[in-house]
A protein has these predicted regions:
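A short glycine-rich, Lys/Arg-flanked "PGG" loop and its adjoining helix->strand segment in the class I
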Residues: 96-99, 162-177
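Conserved SAM/SAH-binding beta-strand->alpha-helix loop
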Residues: 110-112
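Conserved SAM-binding strand-loop segment of SAM-dependent methyltransferases
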Residues: 124-138
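Short, glycine-/aromatic-enriched active-site segment of Class I SAM-dependent methyltransferases
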Residues: 184-204
């Protein structure tokens, strides 16, 4: 697929999620926990009950693969930039930590997501959070303006990950930090999955090898690049997800082989510093 086709597919896929409330990367029935699937998935990947209760209703769509805010060591007064902010879940958690003197900027390329995030911010009474429409490869933020860049299961969706990391580097102040949670590969995916549009939207075929991912961060200029945590991605929990069903149908993968495919996939939490 061409880069423009990938972006169009991702934008349309996440636009539907914003309006329908279904996760592309999480189950919609009882595979991972029955009712309140977004909440169940979020608990599985590291969010506490307190964090889930602290955000406006509808902010958590169950789209993440980790909890970057918990690992970011945010301080009062800091400026936080969230790449691929979605409905604002991590932004709202970050806003509580940086306080009234701080600021959180969420960037997303999907108009429906930005609209939903702004509605959530208004409903929650957040004054220190701003959502901007834009691509993470071309961030609508000034140079040297953020203290920390966070992102949660989004950069894997970009067809130009090197550009994303360069943009994150540009946006950070000297001494600024990067803390991201994302999906990477331990081994190459089957060709049928790599060529699946549905798999790309579902956070699968856009993922790259772990070493290549870390090299891209270093190539952007970051130092102290460190994998803080890594866990296997519970892809078998996608068996009832509409996107997962589309992946199965379009790629020919048998449902029972999903867990085997999951052995190729990691959720990693990576930190780095702009010197």
């Amino acid at each position: 697929m061409k880069d423009s086709e990938i972006r169009k597919a991702v934008r349309e896929g996440y636009g539907k999620i914003a309006t329908q409330g279904n996760s592309c990367c999480a189950p919609t029935t009882s595979c991972c926990g029955g009712a309140g699937i977004a909440e169940a998935v979020s608990k599985t990947i590291g969010y506490s009950e307190e964090e889930l209760r602290a955000v406006p209703e509808g902010a958590n769509l169950g789209l993440g693969c980790g909890n970057p805010v918990a690992l970011a060591s945010l301080r009062e007064g800091e400026v936080v930039l969230d790449l691929g902010a979605g409905a604002g879940f991590d932004c709202f958690l970050a806003a509580d930590r940086v306080g009234k003197k701080g600021k959180v900027i969420g960037v997303d390329m999907t108009p429906e997501m930005v609209e939903k995030a702004r509605e959530n911010a208004a409903n929650g009474g957040y004054k220190n959070v701003e959502f901007r429409l834009g691509e993470i490869e071309n961030l609508p933020v000034a140079d040297n303006s953020a203290d920390i860049v966070i992102s949660n299961c989004v950069i894997n969706l970009s067809p130009d990950k090197k550009r994303v990391f360069k943009e994150a580097f540009r946006a950070l102040k000297p001494g600024g930090r990067l803390m991201i949670s994302d999906i990477v590969l331990l081994r190459e995916l089957p060709e049928s999955v790599l060529n699946s549009v549905e798999a790309y939207i579902g956070c699968l075929s856009g993922a790259v090898m772990k070493d290549a991912y870390l090299k891209a961060i270093k190539a952007a200029g970051f130092k102290q690049v460190k994998v803080v945590e890594e866990t296997t991605f519970p892809i078998e929990c996608m068996a009832n997800d509409p996107t997962a069903q589309a992946i199965i149908e379009s790629s020919g993968i048998r449902r029972e082989d999903l867990s085997t495919l999951g052995e190729s996939i990691l959720s990693v939490k990576v930190s780095a510093v702009k010197p």
